[in-house]
Each structure stands twice: as structure tokens, then as C-alpha cells.
Amino acid sequence: VYSTYLYVHRRVLEDGYDARIVSGVTSFCAAAASLSEGLVENSEELHVIPASYQIEDALEFSGTKVLMKAGKKMPAVKQFLKEKNCRAVMVENCGMDTEQKYFSAEEIPDQASYYSLIIVKEKRKK
């Protein structure tokens, strides 16, 4: 979960400095809280997926999918979400003054920041 930070962490250690990893609130948990939503319920599964790679197969997984760092490939990601008729919400810059929330694939802009994540939930049966 500390993927990007670990690159910096290793370099700091290699340069002879002391560094520690301190636990905190993950961005996808903060985004769900900002949306006043849980990520999963009961026996649902949670999948955290880097959106900068192929997501097509991953969106077939059952449960909730979190697409991390979705900004780079946003037009392709949006198109795929629309084609699959996914229930998707996006939080951009979670916890920052510039935080934005989008509540459907149609609302999500084609250009988004590095700090954009999309939560894809299965549609509930009525």
C-alpha cells in the first residue's frame, strides 16, 4: 500500500539516513469515508488495483474494486467503466483543499490528477 513511498524510503536508507514507515489512513479508506460509504459488506471482497495497467480482467473480480492512480489513463478507464455499466465513484485529491467527488462514470472528467482513485462496486440486487 506504500508503493510510491517505498521508492523514496529505499533511496533515503541507501543514502545512509534513518527512515521509518509509520502507519496511517490509506487513501482508499479516506476516500470511502469522505463519501460516507463502506468499501465492502459482509463477505464481499476488496481488490486494490493500479489503474495505470490493464484493468479489464480486474473489473471482472467479484466485490469492490479500487482503481488507484487512475489519472494517467482516465479516458480509457472511463470508457471501460461505461461499457461494463459499472457503479463507479471517483475522489480526486482526497483530504486536500482541492478534493473533488464524482458520483458516476459520466461525471468523471477526462483529465484527472495523479491523486485520483475510483471505487467500483457491484450493483446491488433489489
Segment roles from a protein language model:
Residues 59-126:
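A contiguous loop/helix-start segment that scaffolds small-molecule binding in enzyme catalytic cores
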Residues 1-61, 109:
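Class I SAM-dependent methyltransferase SAM-binding "motif I" and its flanking Rossmann-like core
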